[in-house]
């Protein structure tokens, strides 16, 4: 039996999106898979400045739980956690404990993506020696 493909997924508001779930499911269809989903706890600048991280963590946790449950219904056995607000740091933290074979970063479309405006996918590809796939999820048609 072959070793499972270890997939790290970094997504927040896009974590429930159908394109992301389709990408994960496609990899699961190829053979055994282990999936770790990390949802960075994104916060507004004002809330961050006021040190109010609780609302961001709760929102990320709710989205993450819904994502994990949806994946389980399709036969994928994922696990996940809420990560650092900085998605690159959240990715790095996850890679310290999860030896991924591949990373999927899910973002909003370019015109609405803060992560793409900050070149997150390009920076991740420069920083980590792993294949990094980019999946675009339009939140208005996410599920």
Task: Report each predicted region and the residues it spans.
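Small/aliphatic-rich secondary-structure junction motif
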Residues: 2-51, 130-139
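Short secondary-structure boundary segments
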Residues: 39, 102, 107-108
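N-terminal targeting/anchoring "stem" of glycan-biosynthesis enzymes
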Residues: 88-90, 126, 137
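Glycine-rich, Arg-bearing micro-motifs that act as flexible, cationic patches
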Residues: 107-123
